[in-house]
Amino acid sequence: KSRQGLLLQRCDWLPIARKLDLIEPAARHFLRGVIERVREKHVNGEDLRLYLPVAASSLFDPAFAPWLAAEFGAHAVPSHVVALEFDAAEARAELPRLRGALEPVQRVGVRLALNVGAADAADLGKLLAIDAFGVVKFARAGDADAKPETAWEPWSKAIAEARSLGKIVVASGVAGMADIGVLLRFGVHYAQGDALSGWLAEWDFDFAEAEL
């Protein structure tokens, strides 16, 4: 009821929403706010493209895709400027019924991205084989002090596989320009990270993209 707001990152609001059994309402409220943000930027002539973290369980709500399409239409925001980002571990847990659930959301026109963390290195093949995931984000392994080779070498085979399947490959959490040489060698398409640009870093979306 106040005009003051507290920005909750995905790691904060998802556990709260699960505990309250409010995953779908929380995700929708979150998405609506960001779509409005995109509209504001487009009105001002700025080109803002976003990755939006979404719980995989949202896909199994039959009303989710129609609602998403209606939100884009209501705010006059083209759906292709948004990529819905799914955590690889969550997606793997829902793998048996995931493929069919992705189709209605695909028809809305949004890109679908897979966010792969350090704990998701095993058994990525089945997820990468899903055509709907056109974008794959690989997070830097280790902390910012880890050497570039140490931080990115664990992803070398997975990046090569994703590229062979025609995916757009994104490296997230880039710690500095020293990482870029390794990423170029691996054939990564885009790099993201606060080290490249601090713009809106507090949103934890890595808005800044530097094409390699």
Where in this protein do the model-derived segments appear?
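Structural preference for long, well-ordered alpha-helical segments in enzyme cores
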Residues: 17, 30-38, 64, 68, ...
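EAL-family c-di-GMP phosphodiesterase catalytic domain
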Residues: 2-5, 55-60, 83-94, 110-212
